[in-house]
Amino acid sequence: MDKEIYCGSVPVSYFDPFDLFESLRPEFQQILPLDNIHWKAFDGTVRTVNRLPIELIPEGRGEADKSNDEQPFIRFLIVNCISIDQYRAKVRPLVRQWLPNLESVSSSTGEKMIYKPIILLYANSEVVDSNLFKSVSLMEKFGKDFPHVQTLEVRSVYRSPKERQEFWNQFSQKIKASVLSIFQKRLTHLQHSLANLQKGNNFEEQLLTREKLYELYVVFNILEDASLELQKIKKEILRRNMNMPDGKLQVPFESSSKSDESLGSIIIEGTLDKFQLHKYFFIRRLRLLKLEDQTLTAFVGAFQLIKNFIESISIEYRKSVRLLEFKHYFITSMLSYFEFENVSNPLLCEIKAELLMLKRDNWVQGVMATSGYRLMDKNYPNSDVKYKFDLLKETFVDETVFQENFLTLTKEILSLFNKCEGKRQRIVDILSIEIGLLYYQGKKYEEAVSLFLSCYEYYTQTNWNSIGLKILQVFIDSLSHCPKLDVLQIDGESVSASAVLTNAFLNILKLCKDNDSKEIWWKKFMDLQMKNNIHLMYPLDGLFEVTLNSKVHLARANVSAIEVNLKSYGFPEDISTKTMRLSLKNMGGDVIVFGASDFLLKKGENKLILECRDIMYGEFSLLSFEIIVEGITFVKEFPENQDEFIVVPEIYCKESTKVLVKQAHNLNLGEYALELKSVQSDALESLQVEVEVQKNIGNMKNLPVSFSMDEIQARKRYNTPFENVRLEYYLLDQITAFDLIIKTSFTKKNDQGTFGETKKVRIQCYLQLSVSVEDIFKKDIFFFKFLLNSSVREEPVILYSSELSAPDTRNDYNIRGDYIATTPALITFDGNESFINCYEITANNNFDSKDIFNLKVRYNTLKEQLDCFITDAVLIEGDVEWFILFEKWKTFWELEILKKLKYDYDAFKENRIIRLLKTSIDLNKTKSKIRNLCIEKAVLDKILICLNKVSRGIAVCNTDMDEYVRNLVPKQLTVPVQLPGFEQFFHVQFEQMETSHDALHDTIATIGNSLSYTVIVENLSGQWGQDVIDDGGYIFEILSSNEWLIHGQKRCAIKEKRKEFEVHLIPLKKGYLNFPRVEITNINGKSCRVDHSNAFESILIF
């Protein structure tokens, strides 16, 4: 774009008769352009001009008699003076000669001249401050001789850099004030003139004045007001609805100030045409955008303005034979607006590329309209206009030059669009196609292949099938013309040309609509496959349509199946498939595959049953669907974020072989074990089972349990068939539950192939029953007192029996106290409601502290009992026919529904009502989940009815409960309990001495009267197989109290097995008095175990 279009600078002239300006130029360049000029508009708002360029013009360019808009704002006269004689003889006459030229009114226009003359006195000595004229300084002398002209000092030599900066800062402020003052005066003058003109009907003069206002605002960079003035000009022009000729397009287009005439002047001359009007407003609007800060918004605005101008001219002058030439030169001119070094901004690259593409397409249209040259697949609308393109003849002197210029232009545009950060990928592909078609047209087939390789795939994938098909046909033809091209480089990998060609044939089959064309390309595809046997992956969509029935069912024992509807419409005939696979993936990333082999896929609709022998249960999302035909794998990959999921349930089948893993029913206290049971094991030929412990979610670093006590073992394998296996494990963390992954692989005797199952099993490893024990010693009897409670507050326990067995090594113990319930007892967590079970143990021989007894407790949790009752009594209700339908879903019922039920145990305990807690289960979600299964309606309905009943509450009696839970297998906990270690043990008895009357019944005991008793102390160590100690090592003592006075042998040594002595007890209180306490200690003062038979007896004293 020509430089003259940029007019945003304030003109300032200088007259330099002494050739001083060049020494001052660096100083002026330091302060220019002026910055931060504040102008207060008439409405009171303050506008800030951040940057105001100043154009310094030698006085020679300002000598002519000009109007205000052509005159400088300031006129400088630069002089110096070092003596009185020089001032009087040369300087003063020169100033007086210069001043008469500064007329107040233009002689040619009669317009008042508004500018400011300033004398610049150049001095690098003290002459300015010295009094050359005795009483006044040189500056004062200038002021006295020329009072109406401002005189300013300028210099180029300073005492310091700081002085220099301060001096020119002050000078800059004075120039700002002068420029602002002249701007304000000119603005006021023009506005007054316009106001006066609006009173009359002189439209042309009003228009001229508005144009001057616009120019003044532009010069001073007040762009908002300039834009408003331009809009007013346009509004006035349109309002007058002037008749004007079309005019001629300016070829070549000029945007210089010489061609940018005043609109008012043109109207006065009567030469205005439509082209001049379009150009006038375009140039001025573009000028305003040019003066704005060089932001992306300004560039986008300029680009839109240029496009709109081209569109307007194209419509207005569509019949002009010079239209294409005009557009070419116009766009060339406008491209200079976007010339920057090292352009890297994507938006600027995009704008420039768009303009270049407009220029190229216009040029191609001009060439094709005026010559016989053609480009493949490049067409323009037919036109009756015989366009001229003579000025650009050298760009297409022959077809080779034409194609080379087209290629150069396209590559330049392509390079710019490639810098747009992928925003214009479609245009990049289109341009690449055009280059490829040019190569193909020039029989440069290898170059064409390299370009088309990615382009046609883009169009077929974006459903631009018509374009994709054409390019594809050209690509195949180009590749067919390259017999030596065996390998192509695609994304850095080497791919055989045959594979690429096979892929292209499939693309053709996808895009072809008529069957005849499909047959031709299908034959070519089959011939190529027969010759090369290519293996590749290809998208399934476009050739097949897949619809899934998301409900998985059991095809036969150990085989799950899913139904698929497959429509084949991409091939002209039936095709034989080798394999079809549907892959599903769960949240953990595990994949299961349903498949079918050797299936004849008919053209049109097909219904398939895909089977899975290596099954896994849970919720799965669709991963992919594959069909293998003639070595080609057609794949449909499903998106990761999808709402649809497929539930693979565990369906029960009597004939199915599987391995069940659960917590062992019979456990010893402190022991942890699993039970592995092989179902239908007699049908197995081989069996491999892997039990793997999963890390807990709360502690992913460590394993919760190990299968070895000596080392951490997370995996256990079995490689031979079995019926039942007990697998012990050891806790490594404080947990109540953990997860196992059970992987089973097996073959059957009467069925070919390998079967497998992978399932996740949750093991509850906490003990549901809490057992504590106390021991009680008596003279000839020993008691165990067991207290039983539920170990978890939320999980009551049902107790069936409690039996204590003697050690296997002895049979002379007599045990009494076994508990066998007629109606199971309900045990809770509450310690105040413990179930107490006492056992009386006597020994024919001695007790042995090494002997270990076993308490065997048979129990279930209340939830297990209620689950059983709900299943048998509420759900099945003895309906055999319905149970046959339900049986295959009983595993799903147990794992997915029963496990989630939470009962109101308080309601059951108090009123024998089975009812679910409100937070137990969401019936709507459960209903929705069940409907995703291929479950029969009769089964579904009854399950929902059952859940509704239990949600409301069901009253039961003990008889019904006992009857329906007979099939519930009790758990058994064996608690080993050992007799306490040997301690010295004594039996003490107060035996009343014989009198003529029974002292306790026939005589009245009164306070102060003694009562006679024989105290018998027996050492019972013999009952524990220990020798009696007779060395006096134990001391017997009757303890004093405030109730009794002891008379007799109160304290003595125990030296024999049995000792008897007499004491007299004198009561000191009335009422019921307990016998005195006794104590036996060893010589170290430690108390021994004593069985005091009178400890809880009392005597009534009167």
Curated annotation (Swiss-Prot):
Output the Gene Ontology cellular-component terms.
Answer: cytosol; early endosome; trans-Golgi network; TRAPPII protein complex
Keyword set, alphabetical order: Autophagy, Golgi apparatus, Transport
One GO BP annotation is: retrograde transport, endosome to Golgi
According to its UniProt record, where is this protein located? Golgi apparatus
Domain of life per record: Eukaryota
Remaining remarks: Present with 432 molecules/cell in log phase SD medium.
Give the similarity note: Belongs to the TMEM1 family.
Subunit info here reads: Part of the multisubunit TRAPP (transport protein particle) II complex composed of BET3, BET5, TRS20, TRS23, TRS31, TRS33, TRS65, TRS120 and TRS130. Interacts with YPT31 and YPT32.
What's this chain's function?
Answer: Specific subunit of the TRAPP II complex, a highly conserved vesicle tethering complex that functions in the late Golgi as a guanine nucleotide exchange factor (GEF) for the Golgi YPT1 GTPase. TRS130 plays a role in the YPT GEF activity of TRAPP II in concert with the two other TRAPP II-specific subunits TRS65 and TRS120. Required for both the cytoplasm-to-vacuole targeting (Cvt) pathway and starvation-induced autophagy through its role in ATG8 and ATG9 trafficking.
Q: PANTHER family per the record?
A: EPILEPSY HOLOPROSENCEPHALY CANDIDATE 1/TMEM1, TRAFFICKING PROTEIN PARTICLE COMPLEX SUBUNIT 10
According to UniProt, the name of this protein is: Trafficking protein particle complex II-specific subunit 130
